[in-house]
């Protein structure tokens, strides 16, 4: 039976502002990435998200981003590798404290937004992220864009496990990178198209680029976004379609 991880970015509410559909999404995913306060989230939200994740027995990971609350961590920043290292180490250490306090164990780290996209093509950024993970806890996995040489090389250098990730509702360029969110065609808004893309990636190992060319994708985890208007409906549908196709949903071991 084919096995795949379904992950989702959660814990992105901040103070009085609610973001996402965390409670409703949790039953349909196998791992979550918790915002750590830089691009979203706050200490109380981090604690509550960890506690809910443990109740649902899903794998918990840190979701560090750039210090950019107003831009939700989606804007590129001109930063050094040392700054990236500091940002990531600080954030994963903070989440790890909440996980340990709740009696759990953190499983992975997935960079957020612009940090993720920059790391996918910038070896220095990817190296800084992997180095922070290695120094924090080398048993933590790194979730990174499938086929990214920068992520692959950084994980190999520090001997940490790379979990290659694909996206359910994002379009791909010919080189295998994600279409920028500044482009009109960055998101797949049709639910059936997104589901077909996921099945194509999981069962056949490729995705159609925006140019119509096939791009090889060997994904071990699929990201579902939890903040869309129909996010819960989509997650439930993916979950049931996987069941019908005998695709097991399980966090990486």
Curated annotation (Swiss-Prot):
One of its GO terms (biological process) is carbohydrate metabolic process. InterPro entries: Glyco_hydro/deAcase_b/a-brl (IPR011330), LamB/YcsF/PxpA-like (IPR005501). It catalyses: 5-oxo-L-proline + ATP + 2 H2O = L-glutamate + ADP + phosphate + H(+). Its EC number is 3.5.2.9. Keywords: ATP-binding, Hydrolase, Nucleotide-binding. The keyword Nucleotide-binding applies. The keyword Secreted does not apply. It comes from the Bacteria. Pfam families: LamB_YcsF. Belongs to the LamB/PxpA family. Forms a complex composed of PxpA, PxpB and PxpC. This is 5-oxoprolinase subunit A. It comes from Bacillus cereus (strain AH820).
